[in-house]
Amino acid sequence: HCGQEFYRSKDGLGNTYNTLDHINAVNWSLVDENQEDIETLKQMIQLRKENGGFKYETIQEVNEYVSTNHFDYRILRYCVKQNKGKYQEIVAYFNPSYYDFEINDMDEYEVIYNDHESRTYLAPISMKIFGLKR
C-alpha cells in the first residue's frame, strides 16, 4: 500500500498490482501537506512494534486478550492485554462522532498517544491511547 499514508487514491482503482508506475508511485509532494498525519502513523507503527498485544496470531489469543466496548453508541474502547512489552494492558478510545466524551477510571494508566491536551477529554473525531505499566 505504498503511498497510502499520503492519502493517494490510486485514481480510484481497487487493485493496482498490474497497472503502470504512475498509478502506484508515491506522490512526494504530499509529504509536507500531510506531515502531522505521517508522524502519527509512525507513532502507531512504533507502538505496534514494541507491544506483542497487537500481533496475536490466533483467534484464541485474540478472544483471550482483546476486548471491545461501545459507549453511547459512538465511542469505541479497545483493550489489549499482553504478556510482553512495557505495558500489561493498552486501552485505546476512538471517537468517530461529532460529540465530546469524558474518559474516566484511567488514573493508573500512562498516556501513550493523545491528540489533544486533556487527559480525560476525548474530542470529536479523535483517539487517545493509554498503557498500564507492569
What do the predicted segments below correspond to?
Residues 105-116:
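Solvent-exposed beta-hairpin/edge-strand motifs
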Residues 33-35, 110, 129:
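A broad, structure-centric signal for solvent-exposed, well-ordered loop/edge residues
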